[in-house]
Curated annotation (Swiss-Prot):
Binding site for ATP: S23, G24, G25, L26, D27, S28
EC primary class: ligase
Name of the protein in its database record: tRNA(Ile)-lysidine synthase
Lineage: Bacteria, Pseudomonadati, Campylobacterota, Epsilonproteobacteria, Campylobacterales
Domain notes: The N-terminal region contains the highly conserved SGGXDS motif, predicted to be a P-loop motif involved in ATP binding.
UniProt record similarity statement: Belongs to the tRNA(Ile)-lysidine synthase family.
NCBIfam families linked: lysidine_TilS_N
Role summary: Ligates lysine onto the cytidine present at position 34 of the AUA codon-specific tRNA(Ile) that contains the anticodon CAU, in an ATP-dependent manner. Cytidine is converted to lysidine, thus changing the amino acid specificity of the tRNA from methionine to isoleucine.
Gene name in the database record: tilS
Amino acid sequence: MTARDFKNYLEPLREGKNLLGFSGGLDSTCLFHLLVGENIAFDIALVDYSTQKQRLEIIQHAQKLAQTHHKKCYIHYAPKIARNFEMQARKVRYDFFETLIKEHSYKHLILAHHLNDRLEWFLMQLSKGAGLNTLLSFQAYEKRESYAIVRPLLYTPKDTLKTLAKDQKFFEDDSNSSLKFKRNCFRKHYANALMQHYSKGIIQSFKFLDKEKERLYPLIPVSQMHGITFFKHSHNALFMVDKILKKKGYVLSFLQKEEIKHHFFSLEIAQKFIIEKDKEHVFIAFKPQKTLSMPKDFKDRARRLDIPKRLRPVLYAEFLKQPTHDFLTRFKQSLMDL
């Protein structure tokens, strides 16, 4: 594999600061050396879950590798995870990455997901019953609120990485062979055989499906004002809500998506987000941390302007920061201008 195979994903990385999620395994080790070979500047971040026998050796190796190539190496020692390991480990990992991104102004988070990872996810979601958006959840370039996730290896089979990394030192994670994890069951019983015999066709199918997704889920103009994100209602509304919340660092579950549809886009999610709609728009906002008592005149003006009830506390909290007589009118006008 050469830069030609993933060059489309390298160009954004040539500007701004980059952070590579590193584990010491085959995938991230291979990506580390590919990025070095392409003169992409980046630092690395590693999470120690205290689950691997070679954990201290992995940490020392990561630090030495970073030092050799003049890169920063951030390490997070995660607390013990008692249950739901995969889900909790993912949360710990992404929280750590996002903390570093905010503190050090990284523009891109580089992850080493490859074609086998994508197929395993696809098969798992297919078995549960999922739409195209969920089946293709992994994207090579994924914009978040203040940074972008870049996955340069998303169309690269794991066997290709093994060939590339044959002279590199990397560590096998023992948990990858444990069948108590659902992903490993799908890998052993289904994905490995499919990749062994049909990898070229699988690559092409994912490329076709990605293009179909772009056509089926066109991006809708999104605006933001006074801490509220909003867009015009359409048949893609749930897709847009999912995409916006991902940018804000929150991933909706299947049940939450069903709940949003059941409540017709008027509810609270995870006691953290407000989702609301009017006749033409869908709104997303962080729920205010404190319940504020709104004066009667503010409530009356919001009611006369047909501003949905769930949004009024959000707007009032913002109004207190910048009180102006036309505060609500300007917000209403921004909806009309969308």
